[in-house]
Amino acid sequence: MSKKMDRCSFCGRTEREVTQLFQGPGDVFICDSCVESCHSLLRDDMYSLAREYENLRDGKSSNNKNYKGKIELLKPVEIKAKLDEYVVGQDEAKKVLSVAVYNHYKRILNNGQDDDGVELQKSNVLLVGPTGSGKTLLAQTLAKILNVPFAIADATTLTEAGYVGDDVENVLVRLIQACNYDIPNAERGIIYIDEFDKIARKSENVSITRDVSGEGVQQALLKIIEGTKSQVPPEGGRKHPNQELIEIDTKNILFIVGGAFEGLEKIIKARTNKKVIGFGAEVQKQDNMGTEGEFFKKVLPEDLMKQGIIPELVGRLPVITTLDNLDEQTLINILTKPKNAIVKQYQKLCKLEGVKLEFTQEALTEIAKRALKRKMGARGLRAIIEHTMLDIMFELPSNNNIKEITITKDTIDNYKKAEIEYK
């Protein structure tokens, strides 16, 4: 009686028909050909993003119909006018950003067209301003106006490669994911890094200990911000051996970084010899020092270095602009003037329920005053209105008899119920 011949459990071929047959638990076998087939399937899945990337790079194909090879560039005046529709105040910052963005994308469109040997450098932007002054909103609105990919990164979560936290290169992954892995589109996008001041090194002197979330992050950001070809994992996270990586060129990515830079005012005061304490003439100087915003307008690169930003990184952020503290009237305007103002948003929500929503002028003033007390800028406005509207939005969908709701000063100040007009 002949011996039973072993077969591959997947394709059914006998051991004579294959080069090698591997045995698993029990009588399960797999041949070398099936192993290779499984490996090919896994490899194709892992490399699919990379292949699409290569096709996009070579101009062969693109599955992303939203990608537009031609950038429709607005003039600086037009960019600022668009910003005015969404952002209240901060005119100086809007002008600086409009010019910087125009020059940046003009540089991209003109790249390689001139033969005079003049190479236009990238002008990344640093926004200095208090919490809630509109730094993030300005960056978001710019990306929306220009129809380019946009990603936000929080600098406080970034650490040097190899340590717990997000690798700096993960900010590039967010941008790639924001445009559905369309690499050429990502390579002309905008990245906003918030809380940039939080990665300042602990002192001006070079430390003998490793500062993985401060100077270490700054060093890692240097090349990315200046322009380099980075290898990043498609899904982010840490790099692993044998992992397929996607290459992205950052030379045409505009980086906008922002921070409150608490303590910068004192550094500027010290440089301009206007002392916080003193007698006689010095007291007179202190009385005429102006507001915090006016001092920020005098910021120089050397002040940022004293704050803990390394000189090399300061040099890669040539455009520096400051944002003003928001006063009461500006906060009131923020509530009602922009296209997507928070009051307009709630009015639309109520309109969808068939109800008219109104805020009295006294109520708007009280909201602005409360936001000023909280020292949260425009962010405080949303928090106050969200709290005020909570009960109303909870009950409104269940009540079909309401015609109009009016939010008064007492609704804000004394937590009284809003005035309701029934049908």
Swiss-Prot record:
GO BP field: cell division; proteolysis involved in protein catabolic process
Any one GO molecular-function label of the UniProt entry: protein dimerization activity
Pfam hit, one: ClpB_D2-small
UniProt KW keywords: ATP-binding, Chaperone, Metal-binding, Nucleotide-binding, Zinc
SMART domains: AAA, ClpB_D2-small, zf-C4_ClpX
Binding residue positions for ATP: 130-137
Domain ClpX-type ZB: 1-50
Listed InterPro entries: AAA+_ATPase (IPR003593), ATP-dep_Clp_protease_ClpX (IPR050052), ATPase_AAA_core (IPR003959), Clp_ATPase_C (IPR019489), Clp_protease_ATP-bd_su_ClpX (IPR004487), ClpX_bact (IPR046425), P-loop_NTPase (IPR027417), Znf_CppX_C4 (IPR010603)
GO cellular component assignments: HslUV protease complex
Residues where Zn(2+) binds: 8, 11, 31, 34
Quaternary context: Component of the ClpX-ClpP complex. Forms a hexameric ring that, in the presence of ATP, binds to fourteen ClpP subunits assembled into a disk-like structure with a central cavity, resembling the structure of eukaryotic proteasomes.
Role noted for this protein: ATP-dependent specificity component of the Clp protease. It directs the protease to specific substrates. Can perform chaperone functions in the absence of ClpP.
Family note: Belongs to the ClpX chaperone family.
Name of the protein this chain belongs to: ATP-dependent Clp protease ATP-binding subunit ClpX
Species annotation: Fusobacterium nucleatum subsp. nucleatum (strain ATCC 25586 / DSM 15643 / BCRC 10681 / CIP 101130 / JCM 8532 / KCTC 2640 / LMG 13131 / VPI 4355)
